[in-house]
């Protein structure tokens, strides 16, 4: 099987267990997909779990165990073959997530990439910081499918043995192994070797701005605005009385020391600034967080657009992700505008609260939850609701808290979610 003559890329992850490899692989894929590239992770561990079962003892990973070594190679080859097939069928960036801990294994990946005329870069995660390794071991015990339902102490002990076996055979990347990036001590140092081309360069830039530390991200829309009440889109209106109540409730919600952002980000529009005014937290007003631009239709209701400009209304209904009102923006445009926000958000090591607008939060939420960008116009972003997100190695934990003071808050949120902003 040969990959068609087009620009394709393999990103092969390298590193010992508990160094954040899967977390990094998923982040790369998520970021590239969000930017419009077709990226997919091929995790060799998933192949092992599917075909051999998840409950393999640590001795399975002993380099002196011939049966285990043979079985692991078979799974690695199966993932590699599927990855090449996916690229041949139109995929763009394949992330090969495994330890790839020896020169022999990496040479096999390089040979495969060369045979199929696909560019290859290695991304090696190196960490000798005991505190980080310990935290990753505990996180793996909690979230890895390998240890689901296993006693905590047994899981940790077994995983430590697995790490020790990998350490016996581990060979770090060398300068003669082609294009690679080394991430040392969760981003303290980045070393690159023979990196060329737009996508590899973009990946390196992204990797320079991520970290493995835990932190919370909160998303909330501004309080109900006067335009929300009138059903109008866009504009720069002030909060309604109900929106003002939410502003006060938001401040009370974040008054707990256990739930305090290090920083608040808002747009430059009045309704987000008003919403955050009671928060005694450093606040930044960022133009890139402004609501999706409705162009010449700004200030109209959807009923007015439907009656006066039926062709535009129908065109947007047909392609909500790609359509832009005259002199306005589409969701696709918005995602490009938000790219610096995403990079800055990834860089932040401390919790952040973002007070923004429906379309903007849909796009940010889609990124953080690894939802295809094309689906973001249809995500539910109700007013007066705080969404708490906690990125983890195998996903993102979410909780939602309604701060609506009205007696029928669920109904109000549902109604306003459809017309209280750019929908």
Where are the language model's segments positioned?
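Extreme N-terminal, non-catalytic leader segments
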Residues: 1-10, 35-38, 47, 211-212
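The conserved Walker
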Residues: 17
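Conserved substrate/cofactor phosphate-moiety recognition/catalytic segment
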Residues: 22-84, 90-91, 105, 129-134
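Pre-Walker A (Motif I) flank of P-loop NTPase domains
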Residues: 6-11, 90-92, 349-350
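Acidic, low-complexity terminal tails and accessory targeting/binding regions
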Residues: 1-4, 171-175, 179-180, 189-216, ...
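A glycine- and Lys/Arg-enriched "phosphate-lid" helix/loop adjacent to the NTP-binding pocket
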Residues: 58-70, 112-172
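Phosphate-coordination/substrate-recognition cap region in phosphate-metabolizing enzymes
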Residues: 98, 103-107, 111-112, 119-143, ...
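Hydrophobic anchor at the beta1->P-loop junction of P-loop NTPases
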Residues: 13, 354
